[in-house]
Design a protein with these regions (language model features):
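A generic structural signal for short, non-catalytic loop/turn and secondary-structure boundary residues
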Residues: 40, 223-225, 256-257, 266
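Generic, low-specificity signal for short hydrophobic/alpha-helical stretches with a mild N-terminal bias
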Residues: 3, 64, 156, 231-235, ...
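Generic amphipathic alpha-helical segments used as scaffolds and interaction surfaces in large
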Residues: 4, 8, 157-161, 165, ...
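Activation/maturation switch segments at domain boundaries
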Residues: 2-27, 242, 278-287, 294
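Residues in well-ordered beta-strands of folded domains
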Residues: 48-50, 231-233, 274
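Long, contiguous, structured domain-core segments that constitute the functional module of a protein
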Residues: 211-241, 245-252
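Extended, low-hydrophobicity segments enriched in charged/polar residues
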Residues: 7-224
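C-terminal structured domains
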Residues: 235-294
Length: 294
């Protein structure tokens, strides 16, 4: 059901949601439109809720909610879900940002991630970044609050000036943190897939158990030759492409494979490693890159 059978375009949908949220929380809060450019220069359209004199402004993005609305959900029900989301943050104490100007206090929370340079030109306009081959390294601060959960804050040039450090120091400290907190995992792609599918198979609510069992059996039966694609990531499988920045990582991969190898950035979470066994020509490599990134 829609409002009297009428379908709103996105801008009017957003205004209606803002109206519902504003009416619910009253004058003590302000509701603002907030657009955010994230990885691969994708722009997300959201709204934020801020209590007066607070430095917390939680955001909820409306793009997917509009698709749900377009598929038949009522705007009132969507507004209620948005309000429920914001209720989590009401009366939550401010994040402790008092130490953000103290580099020694915050550097243990620094991290890095690797992004595609050409797809993130807008994202890095107000960020500190370092070029790395055809990629870019960007930096963030992790925070964790018992009520809000985990989050990250991108490092900006203003923060770098406030800390009075150079980019080399930032890169060194952030990489050391990642190496300590997110250790390297290097495994064959087949073995990684087997683990992933077994995890799904063990989910008793999964309705495709037999299909998954068949896939696992097929993967397990692959020969050593067919297992020559490897994955470089970290143990959490989150932002694992940054492991190539860890000290000695690539030399250790070379020692493990006992040969030269090719690197194919698959996503921000992993790197595909292909040993140079003499059979990988330009056409084969291009096909692999297209397959990995498809």
């Amino acid at each position: 059901m829609r409002d009297y059978g009428f379908t709103y375009d996105f801008e009017n949908f957003k205004r209606k949601i803002i109206g519902y949220v504003s009416d619910h929380f009253g004058d003590a809060y302000t509701v603002d439109e907030t657009d955010c450019v994230k990885n691969n220069d994708t722009t997300y359209h959201g709204i934020s809720l801020r209590e007066k004199d607070s430095n917390i402004a939680p955001i909820i993005y409306l793009d997917e909610l509009y698709q749900i609305y377009s598929n038949g959900e009522s705007i009132q029900q969507i507004a209620e879900s948005v309000i429920d989301h914001f209720r989590i943050y009401v009366n939550v104490p401010d994040l402790n940002l008092d130490e953000i100007d103290n580099y020694e206090a915050v550097k243990k929370r620094l991290g890095v991630k690797l992004l595609n340079r050409s797809l993130n030109s807008s994202y890095i306009e107000k960020k500190v970044y370092v070029e790395y081959m055809d990629l870019i390294i960007v930096f963030f601060l992790e925070y964790e609050d018992m009520s809000i959960g985990k989050g990250i804050i991108g490092v900006t040039p203003d923060m770098l000036s406030m800390w009075n450090i150079d980019t080399e120091t930032l890169l060194r400290d952030a990489t050391e943190n990642m190496n300590k907190n997110y250790p390297v995992e290097f495994t064959s792609l087949v073995d990684l897939l087997i683990r992933e599918y077994k995890y799904r198979f063990e989910d008793e609510n999964n309705i495709q158990r037999e299909d998954i069992k068949d896939i696992v059996e097929q993967l397990t039966s692959l020969s050593t030759y067919d297992r020559q694609l490897y994955v470089l990531t970290n143990e959490s499988h989150n932002l694992g492409a940054s492991t190539i920045l860890y000290p000695d990582t690539l030399s250790k991969v070379g020692s493990a494979l006992n040969t030269d190898f090719y690197l194919i950035p698959s996503s921000i979470h992993e790197i595909i490693i292909i040993p140079d066994n003499g059979n990988v020509n330009e056409e084969v490599m291009n096909n692999m890159i297209r397959t990995v990134n498809s």
